[in-house]
């Protein structure tokens, strides 16, 4: 699942709590206009799979903060196939391809495997905690 689900995960682990705090900090900066949020059809799709309607509605509210929503096309599929060859799971590959299509500077993920495997792209793939540390003034 994507970072917008992190606040709804079991907060018993320190790492999950830190990532949750980072996600909330990032969302606040988006609301204040300091950052821009890019959304995609993949985020909508994953959210639609969530059986918890309350969480789905919370994430739908986050999607309303996005200035742009990336829709599927052939370029995204081709790009995603390249990521899959690097060992990235199909859904994650589509997320990355959407971010590239949207011209994102950063791709935020709590998945260490994606951070490690998504190389040689014109976008920084980073954990939300590291993003906050790197970008807060």
For the regions a protein language model found, what residue spans apply to each?
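Structural signal for conserved beta-strand scaffold positions within catalytic alpha/beta enzyme cores
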Residues: 39, 70-71, 125-127
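Short beta-strand scaffold positions
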Residues: 71, 90-93, 109
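Acidic, PIN/NYN-like endoribonuclease modules and their adjacent C-terminal/linker elements
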Residues: 10-17, 85-86, 96-137
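Short, well-structured N-terminal submotif of metal-dependent ribonuclease cores
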Residues: 1-39, 49-56, 133-137
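Acidic catalytic patch
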Residues: 42-46, 63-85
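Short, aromatic/basic amphipathic alpha-helical patches
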Residues: 53-62, 117-121
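Short active-site oxyanion
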Residues: 33-36, 66-68, 103-106
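Alpha-helix capping/helix-boundary segments
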Residues: 43, 76, 94-95, 113-114
């Amino acid at each position: 699942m994507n970072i917008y689900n992190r606040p709804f995960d079991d907060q018993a682990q320190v790492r999950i709590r830190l990532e949750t705090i980072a996600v909330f900090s990032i969302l606040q900066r988006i609301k204040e206009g300091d950052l821009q949020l890019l959304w995609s059809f993949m985020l909508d799709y994953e959210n639609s799979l969530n059986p918890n309607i309350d969480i789905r509605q919370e994430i739908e509210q986050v999607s309303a903060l996005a200035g742009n929503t990336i829709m599927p096309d052939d370029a995204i599929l081709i790009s995603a196939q390249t990521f899959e060859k690097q060992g990235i799971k199909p859904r994650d590959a589509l997320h990355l391809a959407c971010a590239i299509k949207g011209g994102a500077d950063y791709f935020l993920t709590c998945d260490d495997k994606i951070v490690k495997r998504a190389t040689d792209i014109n976008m920084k793939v980073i954990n939300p905690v590291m993003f906050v540390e790197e970008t807060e003034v």
